[in-house]
Amino acid sequence: MWHFFKQDKRITIMNIHEYQGKEILASYGVRVQRGIVANNPVEAVAAAKQLTTETGTSWYVVKAQIHAGGRGKGGGVKLAKNLDQVTEISEQIIGMQLITPQTPPEGKTVHKVLIAQDAYYPGESETSEFYVSVLLNRATGRNMIMYSTEGGMDIEEVAEHTPHLIFTEEIDPAYGLQGFQARKIAFNL
């Protein structure tokens, strides 16, 4: 966590990895994609085996853990269809300099990967991607759900070229996410 001052106001920035965010959400009862952090290929394979035992999955998503978005486009998120591919992909990703639109020009070194349950590729065929994010609307100080059927790894391009395909739903903190909002999001997705 970093603290800095801007115009006599203390500003705190919290950077957490995907796996840490999922742990926080899960601690509040939110269902999240199951995943296990690994620091090396041996741990990655052990994590994949554990996921198979716990969830029955036989495909895995190997995800670089750095403080930046765009990891998939930069080669930091890959699908592994077996344990040999988990080894191969984790060897490629751990230690790499991952360069994305949100990293410095030299990129960021990947020290950990998240071996995640295959929640996106059921069976033998790939499904379509979509994008859903909960973020803070700084103008209003409220949480906002941003989503698109055209998202996934290419959300930055969608925002640049077809912004009308990105939808938002602001959440009133006094009431939380309302049923009508959830239905609207589900309908649009």
Give residue spans per PLM region.
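Structural motif
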Residues: 30, 36, 58-61, 76-77, ...
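Active-site cofactor/substrate anionic-group-binding motifs, chiefly glycine-
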Residues: 52-61, 79-100, 151-153, 163
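A conserved helix-loop-beta module that forms one wall/lid of the active-site cleft
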Residues: 13-58, 64
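Glycine-rich phosphate-binding loop of ATP-grasp-fold ATP-dependent ligases
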Residues: 33-35, 62-89, 131, 155, ...
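Hydrophobic alpha-helical hairpins/lids featuring a short glycine-rich hinge
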Residues: 104-173
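ATP-grasp fold ATP-binding core
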Residues: 18-26, 55-72, 100-123, 132
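Glycine-rich, mobile lid/loop segments that gate access to catalytic sites or pores
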Residues: 170-189
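Short, Lys/Arg-enriched N-terminal segments with co-localized hydrophobic residues
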Residues: 1-13
